[in-house]
Amino acid sequence: MSIKIHHGPNGSYKTSGAIQDDAVPALKDGRVIITNVRGFTLERAYQVFPDLPNTAEIINLDLESLEDLEKMRTWFQWAPRGAFLIFDETQLLFPKSWREKDLERFDYPGGPEAAHAADRPMGWLDAWTRHRHFNWDIVLTTPNISYIRDDIRMTCEMAYKHSNLAVIGIPGRYKEAQHDAQLNRPPADGTIIEYKRIRKQTFALYQSTATGKTQDTKAGKSLFRSPKLVLLLALLAGTIGFVWYMGPLRTIGGPAAATPADAPGDPAQAPAAPAAVAAPARPAANSFLPPGLVPDGPAAAPVDLNAHPFADRRISILAHAYRKSRGDIYMFALEDPTGRHLELTSWQLIGSGYRVTPKGECVVELRYEDWKQTVTCAGRQAGAVASIAPAAPVAASADAPARGQSPLTIVPDSEYASRPWRQK
């Protein structure tokens, strides 16, 4: 049992919202409805809702009839218990200009004892403050809540401010903001806002204008006439289209190099012992051996480029540092098959989803989901070794060491002249 106020400018769906949200549920419960909403009759209600309970009743009063106007103003002297009252244009029914003396005429005839015997409120204030004792629900509509008398507003439970969204180019919908009935407008914070739409069957229950013709508001401008909003929507659409066209970004760097296929050959014509040392196969892209130190044997298996984000790059340790507050810190070098070089710290790899487990200054274990690899320092070749290293594989001679023996590298003696005390 409550008193509610629906307020807002003309054409903001106050009356239709009150009927749809409040009167229709009461009608389906079989309650008696007392109202001055034009055209809201029981005949129309049965046309829209044929299965209404037999106890449902609508008492429609005409605001332009002096007799009906007086009945609405003295509703608490004759309304049955449990009735649902919905008063449209409340500012005309209960003017704010009434003073205390004007309200004395609403005292029940015969005084408080007669009112008690008739089970009626004693007067004006008693009716509005003790409406729950008589199971009355009251809904009021007005263009401006400040038109409602203070003694009525102080008994109201909630107020609902209506705004027609057609003023920003969204026809057929309205915004309803719930707030305290003592306030003239909803506060900026903590307001419950709903966006609603009136159903067609609700409009069939009543007549919103005296002529029967209705049209939406012509005030306001479309929301899409704002250049800022149009620019924002265009930027958003362009971003989504660009991402869709480019596809998801999986790895950082260039495309993965294709694994060279084995050269075709006839195994029947192959000699029992090779006459020359075959050219070493290209190391796998994630190999940690520097170029030139390639083991003999068949080519490595193709690299799974989906194992981790940097699967197409060779990873090695460039530097190591230790801080007591942060532990081991590594600098990694990542090189792809085309020679492009990338340097990342262990923190950056951890941020990319890797797990870095230090095993020493030059040994680290990297993990990424199911992938695991041990990374070491790459080091660098000595200048002397590099100077005499052949540019291309040399054919094996007849007296070459057997396959599997360790190769012997001769380094020229660059030591200065023998010391005089050195014994020969």
UniProtKB/Swiss-Prot annotation:
Q: Does the keyword Transmembrane apply?
A: yes
- Cellular component terms per the entry's GO annotation: host cell membrane; membrane
One Pfam family hit: Zot
Superkingdom of this entry's organism? Viruses
The membrane-topology field of this record reads: Single-pass membrane protein
Segments crossing the lipid bilayer:
229-249
Q: What's in the keyword line of the UniProt record? A: Host membrane, Membrane, Transmembrane, Transmembrane helix
What is the recorded function of this protein according to its Swiss-Prot or TrEMBL entry? Answer: May play a role in phage assembly.
> What is the protein name given in its UniProt record?
Uncharacterized protein ORF424
Q: Which organism is it from?
A: Pseudomonas phage Pf1
